[in-house]
Amino acid sequence: MTPEQILDIAPKVLTQTQRESYFNEGYLLLERVIDDHWLTRLRAATDELVERSRAITVSDVIFDLEPNHSAHKPRLRRVSNPVEHHAAYWDYCLHSVMPDIVSDLVGPNLKFHHSKLNFKWANGGEEVKWHYDISFWPHTNYSPLTIGTYLYDCGMEQGPLGVLPKSHLIDPMLSQYDADGHWTGCLSAADCARLDLAKAVFLPGPAGSLTIHNCRTLHYSARNDSDLGRPLLLNTLTSADAMPYTVNPIKPKHDQFMVRGERARFAHHDPRPCLIPPDWSKGYSSIFALQQEEEVQAVAR
């Protein structure tokens, strides 16, 4: 569906002004939307996963660990596919207000793509450099969005999500390959220098707040040097008529599950081109490993 078609449908949760702002600016921040019932469940589930990580010494398909992670002092960067590792996360995707909010932005027919739980651990949780999401998992259109849920209060000291307003309108999109054709998962220093990053907007918020950014919106988060962690639950959802061009790198079992509405009979193709990532059909590490150059070499094109 096009933005115009979506805006013609009466919203379930958002105001029309909020919807128009999302399409114009590429992001939204909604404060204190998720109630204590869901926060309590999600926090308990997250605590259980952190406890499980104590037995892990090397990053695997579930746990992406910081280099100094230990059983005594866990330090996680990410849990991949949390919806597959605790029922609370999947229940949240299906039964909370969150998917109704997303349907106000992508249309009534809504598909799940993937989820992740990013931690930004206290006293050194790593920076995430400026990047687009859609280049990791290109689709036939640009309806996909990522909606983040702050499980605890997040101030500027914890490295909240930062977005560049209207960057979803930049055409053509900037590359996430380097000059030698290797995938880096982020913009080059030269491209960053050409952007007016002084216009970046950061999205701190109290527990239960939602960050929403379009798949073309450039975003970033700073290192967390505070004494408080910043767990952020991220879910990526798409309109039913957005079809993936490539394999889902995280390979979730719920990929393409209809969260709301009905399956599309026709794909919607945006005329703008979309960068294609490397072939991840045999596996994928994480954006953290790529951007921190932990691989022997970035994935070749």
Predicted regions and their residues:
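Short, surface-exposed loop/helix-turn segments at secondary-structure junctions
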Residues: 61-63, 132, 181, 185-197, ...
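Double-stranded beta-helix
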Residues: 6, 20, 154-222
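A short beta-loop-beta micro-motif enriched in histidine and acidic residues
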Residues: 132-144, 198-199, 205, 228-229
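Non-heme Fe(II)/2-oxoglutarate
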Residues: 3-8, 52, 58, 64, ...
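Feature marks short, surface-exposed loop/turn motifs that line or immediately flank catalytic pockets
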Residues: 38, 121, 155, 170, ...
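Generic beta-strand structural signal
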Residues: 108-115, 126-128, 143-149, 159, ...
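Short, conserved beta-strand element in jelly-roll/cupin
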Residues: 138-156, 204-205, 212, 236-239
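Non-heme Fe(II)-dependent double-stranded beta-helix
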Residues: 1-25, 31-130, 135-138, 176, ...
